[in-house]
Amino acid sequence: MSSTQKLTAAGLRYQLFIRNKSLKWMASKLDWDVSKLSRRLKGTPAFNVIEIDRITEILGISFEELLTIPVDMHEKFFGTGTPDLEVTA
């Protein structure tokens, strides 16, 4: 899975976490079953642009906000395999 895919999946998990929402809730909003959402979160296959657009619309956030995870939450949502991402100011 690419760094962007990892960041997107982690961002979605983080957004659900801070909203106290479940994968089941998000899957129902997307008209998917939970197993399809789980596969997408694992990158098999990765989310496509239309799916990401729907997710950000459901959550009421921008794509940039989806990709924003506070540093102190990185380990929780990335584990030890934090993607090698360039940080810009």
Language-model regions: role of each:
Residues 1-22:
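A short, Lys/Arg-rich alpha-helix, primarily the initiator
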Residues 2, 67-89:
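Short, charged recognition helix plus adjacent turn
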Residues 13, 38-39, 67:
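Key DNA-contacting residues within the recognition helix of helix-turn-helix
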Residues 16, 27, 56:
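The alpha-helix within a helix-turn-helix
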Residues 20-39:
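Short alpha-helical DNA-recognition segment
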Residues 41, 51, 70:
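DNA major-groove recognition helix of helix-turn-helix
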Residues 50-65:
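DNA major-groove recognition helix of helix-turn-helix/homeodomain DNA-binding modules
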